[in-house]
């Protein structure tokens, strides 16, 4: 029995375990950026902004996440102080920390918050690209992209438990400056961890290296699989989601306190950690196409469950269950993105696919926020479920088995 459990553990070598710890540490620190979000939302609600306007604010602040391929190109083409990843990681973590401290200094104007929070997001988005590049570069040769991403997202959702519990208290007491101050500490943690854990050989900016990278980019731009996967991810994530609209429903219709809403977020995050733990061994044993189909089905069922979201008990049950299955769904799509990345330009093209993913999520939340204002909660749930289900009809066009086979062949080279 013990031997069977050991075989389920995907990280069998010391090097793989070191990388897993590194990714977990950096992603945990990154996840703490979301600490002020609930307090920002309730502060704007107190100021009279609608759900759609709040969703628009968060869309503005996440613009840096939509141009992530630019950061990948910079990192792939232009080494900083002789390194493609580590030097940039130190610089971007410092930027995020500085902007967070400026936000903590006070002032709750819409424009000021949007500017500084967007700049903080720029530092974190660039950091995310660099860490994802390390994940693809080290994970694909070992067949561990799915397992590494499980560790990354388990770490983020572990931090989300803290965000949910502490963020609920901060929102309840309207302590926005304190929320920013706490969030600003964690990019500093990322900076110290990068200094200690990232081992990267020098990569001088030679002309031939730039030419090779540019040739790889041009070849990848003509790769059908990359663009089909990008379109598929965009379609799936676009379906109108709840986002800030759910908080308005929880507050205005159900009368939940901000503390209880924060607790729901923490419980959902704990379930997401469990979902990531389930996906790690599944990703090495179940064909990805089957996982994608299963992910879409459970996303539809999970969305429809929100029709029963009527009181505290149903909220706890639905948020916990959807937290777990939602994590499995998300990881299946991120695993597909990692396996579709062309070799040699991993930072650029994984960032491209993640920008598509993040862009779809933001469009989804803005659309969902305005639909909630216009048609209400129940029609929003039904529309979201129907569009999610439609993604099943696109699966055959993706040719997922071919993408998996090519990723395996690339790893063997």
Model-derived features: where do they sit?
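Loop-to-transmembrane helix entry/capping segments in MFS-fold secondary transporters
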Residues: 51-52, 140-151, 258-259, 343-353
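Juxtamembrane intracellular "pre-TM" segments in multi-pass secondary transporters
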Residues: 1-16, 199-229
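Multi-pass alpha-helical transporter architecture, strongest
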Residues: 103-104, 189-198, 382-413
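Helix-to-loop junctions at the C-terminal end of transmembrane segments
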Residues: 67-83, 171, 274-288, 372-373
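Helix-loop boundary and gating motifs at the non-cytosolic
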Residues: 4-65, 227-232, 236-254, 261
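C-terminal transmembrane helical hairpin of 12-TM major facilitator-type secondary transporters
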Residues: 289-333
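C-terminal ends and interior cores of transmembrane alpha-helices
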Residues: 90-108, 297-310
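Intracellular juxtamembrane helix-capping segments at the cytosolic ends
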Residues: 126-140, 328-342
């Amino acid at each position: 029995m013990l031997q069977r459990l050991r075989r389920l553990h995907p990280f069998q070598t010391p090097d793989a375990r070191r990388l897993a710890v590194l990714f977990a540490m950096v992603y945990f620190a990154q996840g703490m950026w979301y600490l002020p979000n609930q307090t920002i939302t309730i502060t704007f609600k107190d100021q009279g902004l609608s759900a759609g306007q709040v969703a628009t604010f968060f869309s503005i602040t996440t613009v840096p996440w939509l141009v992530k391929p630019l950061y990948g190109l910079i990192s792939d083409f232009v080494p900083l102080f002789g390194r493609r990843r580590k030097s940039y990681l130190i610089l971007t973590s410092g930027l995020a920390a500085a902007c967070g401290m400026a936000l903590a200094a006070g002032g709750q104007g819409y424009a000021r918050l949007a500017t500084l929070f967007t700049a903080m997001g720029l530092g974190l988005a660039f950091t995310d690209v660099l860490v994802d590049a390390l994940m693809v570069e080290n994970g694909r040769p070992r067949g561990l992209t799915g397992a590494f991403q499980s560790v990354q997202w388990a770490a983020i959702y572990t931090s989300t438990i803290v965000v949910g519990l502490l963020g609920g208290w901060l929102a309840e007491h309207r302590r926005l400056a304190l929320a920013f101050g706490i969030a600003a500490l964690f990019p500093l943690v990322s900076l110290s961890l990068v200094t200690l854990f990232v081992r990267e050989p020098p990569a001088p900016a030679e002309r031939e290296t730039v030419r090779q990278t540019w040739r790889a980019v041009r070849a990848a731009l003509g790769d059908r699989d990359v663009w089909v996967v990008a379109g598929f991810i965009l379609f799936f994530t676009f379906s109108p989601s709840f986002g800030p609209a759910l908080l308005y429903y929880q507050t205005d219709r159900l009368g939940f306190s901000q503390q209880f809403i924060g607790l729901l977020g923490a419980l959902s995050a704990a379930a997401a950690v469990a979902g990531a733990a389930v996906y790690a061994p599944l990703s090495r044993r179940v064909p990805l196409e089957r996982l994608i189909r299963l992910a879409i089905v459970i996303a539809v069922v999970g969305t429809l469950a929100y029709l029963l979201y009527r009181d505290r008990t149903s909220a706890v049950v639905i948020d916990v269950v959807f937290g777990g299955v939602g994590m499995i769904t998300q990881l299946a799509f991120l695993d597909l993105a990692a396996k579709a990345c062309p070799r040699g330009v991993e930072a650029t093209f994984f960032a491209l696919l993640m920008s598509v993913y993040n862009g779809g999520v933001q469009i989804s939340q803005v659309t969902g926020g305005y639909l909630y204002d216009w048609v209400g909660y129940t029609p929003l749930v039904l529309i979201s479920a129907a569009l999610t289900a439609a993604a099943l009809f696109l699966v055959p066009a993706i040719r997922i088995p071919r993408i998996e086979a090519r990723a395996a062949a690339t790893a063997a080279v």
